[in-house]
Swiss-Prot record:
Transmembrane segments: none annotated. Keywords: Cytoplasm, Magnesium, Metal-binding, Nucleotidyltransferase, RNA-binding, Transferase. It comes from the Bacteria. One of its GO terms (cellular component) is cytosol. GO terms for biological process: mRNA catabolic process; RNA processing. Mg(2+) binds at D487, D493. Its cofactor is Mg(2+). It catalyses: RNA(n+1) + phosphate = RNA(n) + a ribonucleoside 5'-diphosphate. It comes from Oceanobacillus iheyensis (strain DSM 14371 / CIP 107618 / JCM 11309 / KCTC 3954 / HTE831). Involved in mRNA degradation. Catalyzes the phosphorolysis of single-stranded polyribonucleotides processively in the 3'- to 5'-direction. This is Polyribonucleotide nucleotidyltransferase. Residues 554-613 form the KH domain.
Length: 705
């Protein structure tokens, strides 16, 4: 890399995009500073000098958020950034997915790519700057990275596609798409959409690719100017003679084992076939390195045979046709005391989702770099080890769980009613009980069932399906509803979720260089057929959301007051609102516009709290008659509470028509009496009269005669 700082500039959507190379982090293999508008991201790539003895490529990608980037100091006692936010984890995955396929097969050096967000302009997405920065850091380094990639966000406002839409444009857009790829093809898609047809989603992807081509060309010029020569790669390879021997000895056994249709029986058959071959070589007392090579060759054979059977003979491991979905079943109200639950089973993949309804005060508070401060709809995904019949430590959610949860959330959020129509916080938890591929899509289906069981008035039911691809040269086969083996050994995992009307979420990961438009179009079309079949199965279980909420769900009353009356409800230091909560046991959430949401499982207490609040904000009207309660007696009169928080004085001369010597001669504490409002003085004091009410009653009787 050049020792002196070099600057390279272009534009993205009219905003300046500048790359600095050669000044910062010079001890790393490659580094660059990206300035996109006022967004600044430092991307750095490093690699170990020697390969690791691992059966996989050890790549780590981190997207690091610094709260100083938006002028915030972290909360808590420590005042440091803690664990990564959900946005940071999802952005790390977003960058990892398009760059991972572009390292040489068999490359085992440890590679770490870190992008640190140092300044944020909300209209210039930091994750896009980090993705392009990661590609540049790898491309200018000596790490063997095959070719640059770029990524963009795509929105659609009033039918027009937009690259990297602003915050204002995002609010109006019916598509939230992130697409990445090389100059030749797409290799990563992440999208949420408002029931958008497949053909429009495809056009959005291809629209994004046109901008990607330009940004890759920009990077290629940059690499010519300051890129380094790549270091020699030591690839994990096996001896040719050994490969031939293992193939001849194991092929028939491997082919037969692969075609055992039941997952566990197939896994056991493959394991037994491998063990027999390994045992044969161990009997010959060969070196440990040879045994490792034999195991690697056998793993490759399984992959090659699965792929050959699919592409050449159109035979899937479990015997299905390429567009066939595994057996489907579903049911609702699985758990009696939860607010809603749904169980969805597709072959040997099973998810149980639970819907919990809460008050609007139960929203998730977000503390990150985005403008969004809270979230009222959440989907969480859990993947225990028992779902694949294994043991293992129980830890908090990892990147995969967070990513799958976010995908389900994105797929479902477009059908969630707004808080005016349905003033609840909604939390979905999906428990994966069995896993043989496509668990994230099963969680979407189960979550739809759970919400319908809970009585959430969703706009339309959502189903999801995972598509696969096996490509060999120009031959390719697209698979519907891929299982675990097809996902692990295939070239693509393309998840599509949506309603009968259109797509609500897409996620595509591939292990090859990229996909053409024709393959994407065919995959989307095939996915739609599968989605419709799954929706039909789900609707046979429950056709529409239940009309009544669960008896165990909180009941919510809504009301509206004038914003300047909010202080009357809250009271000094929250005294008034806490008194209402203590008296009724409800939860009260107040919005700045005067909207009030009262929630509890007891509707009578909700009504009581509402009445108290109505009394607090009620205005006393001169000339009106009220039934009040005597609260305090003085020599000069009685203080009467008209309603909660409002009282007035009945002067001793206004208690009765005749002269009153002592207030106690007419009224006592806690007496209920009818009083008329005579006046409200300049200080807001209310003067009442019992005598006026008596006189009015006499007049009314005389007029009635």
């Amino acid at each position: 890399m050049a020792e002196e700082k070099q600057l390279f500039s272009t534009e993205i959507s009219g905003k300046k995009f500048t790359v600095e190379v050669g000044e910062l982090a010079k001890q790393a293999n490659g580094a660059c500073m990206i300035h996109y508008g006022d967004t600044s991201v430092l991307s750095v790539a490093t690699a170990s000098s020697e390969p690791k003895d691992l059966p996989f490529f050890p790549l780590t990608v981190n997207y690091e958020e610094r709260l100083y980037a938006v002028g915030k100091i972290p909360g808590g006692f420590i005042k440091r950034e803690g664990r990564p936010s959900e946005k940071a984890i999802l952005s790390s995955r977003l960058i990892d997915r398009p760059i991972r396929p572009l390292f040489p097969d068999g490359f085992r050096n440890e590679v770490q790519v870190i992008s640190t967000v140092m300044s944020v302009d909300q209209d210039c997405p930091s994750e896009i700057a980090a993705m392009i920065g990661s590609s540049i850091a790898l491309s200018v380094s000596d790490i063997p990275f095959e070719q640059p990639i770029a990524g963009v966000n795509v929105g659609r406002v009033d039918g027009e596609f937009i690259i990297n839409p602003t915050i204002e444009q995002e609010a109006k857009s019916d598509i939230e798409l992130t697409v990445a790829g090389t100059k030749d093809a797409i290799n990563m898609v992440e999208a949420g959409a408002n029931e958008v047809p497949e053909d429009i989603m495809l056009e959005a992807i291809m629209f994004g690719h046109e901008e990607i081509k330009r940004l890759v060309a920009f990077q290629e010029e940059l690499v010519k100017a300051c890129g380094q020569d790549k270091f020699d790669v030591v690839l994990a390879e096996s001896e040719e003679e050994l490969v031939e021997n293992v193939h001849s000895e194991a092929k028939d056994k491997i082919v037969n084992a692969i075609q055992v249709q039941e997952k566990h029986a197939r896994d056991e058959a493959i394991k037994q076939a491998k063990n027999e071959i390994v045992a044969h070589y161990e009997e010959q007392e060969v070196e440990e390195d040879v045994i490792k090579q034999v195991k690697s060759i056998l793993d490759s054979m399984v992959k090659e045979e699965v792929r050959r059977l699919i592409t050449k003979e159109k035979i899937r491991p479990d015997g299905r046709k390429v567009d066939e979905i595994r057996p489907l079943s579903s049911r609702i109200h699985v758990l009696p005391r939860t607010h809603g639950s749904g169980l969805f089973t597709r072959g040997q993949t099973q998810a149980l989702s639970v819907c919990t309804l809460g008050a609007l005060g139960d929203v998730q508070i977000l503390d990150g770099l985005d403008l969004e401060e809270s979230k009222r709809f959440m989907h969480h995904y859990n993947f225990p080890q028992y779902s694949v019949g294994e043991t293992g430590p129980i830890r908090g959610p990892g990147r995969r769980e967070i990513g799958h949860g976010a995908l389900g959330e994105r797929a479902l959020e477009k059908v969630i009613p707004d808080d005016k129509e349905f003033p609840y916080t909604i939390r979905l938890v999906s428990e994966v009980l069995e896993s043989n591929g496509s668990t994230s899509q099963a969680s979407i289906c189960a979550s739809t069932l759970a919400m319908m069981d809970a009585g959430v008035p969703i706009k339309a039911p959502v189903a999801g399906i995972a598509m696969g691809l096996v490509k060999s040269g120009d031959d390719y086969t697209i698979l519907t509803d891929i299982q675990g083996m097809e996902d692990a050994l295939g070239d693509m995992d393309f998840k599509v979720a949506g309603t009968a009307n259109g797509v609500t979420a897409l996620q595509m990961d591939i292990k090859i260089d990229g996909l053409s438009r024709d393959i994407l179009e065919e995959a989307l079309s095939q996915a739609k057929k599968g989605r419709m079949q799954i929706l039909d199965s789900m609707l046979a279980t429950i056709k529409e959301p239940k009309e009544e909420l669960s008896e165990f769900a909180p009941k919510i009353l809504t009301m509206a007051i004038e914003p300047d009356k909010i202080r009357d409800v809250i009271g000094p230091s929250g005294k008034q609102i806490n008194q209402i909560i203590d008296e009724t046991g409800v939860k009260i959430d107040i919005e700045q516009d005067g909207s009030i949401f009262i929630s509890s499982t007891d509707n009578e207490m909700n009504k009581k709290a509402k009445q108290i609040i109505e009394d607090l904000v009620r205005e006393v009207e001169v000339g009106q008659i009220y039934l009040g309660k005597v609260k305090r007696i003085e020599k000069f009169g009685a203080f009467v509470e008209l309603f909660k928080g409002k009282d007035g004085l009945v002067h001793i001369s206004e208690l009765a028509e005749e002269r009153t010597n002592k207030v106690e001669d007419v009224v006592s504490i806690d007496d209920q009496i009818m009083v008329k409002v005579k006046e409200i003085d300049r200080q807001g004091r209310v003067n009442l009269s019992r005598k006026a009410v008596i006189q009015d009653e006499k007049k009314a009787k005389e007029q009635a005669k």
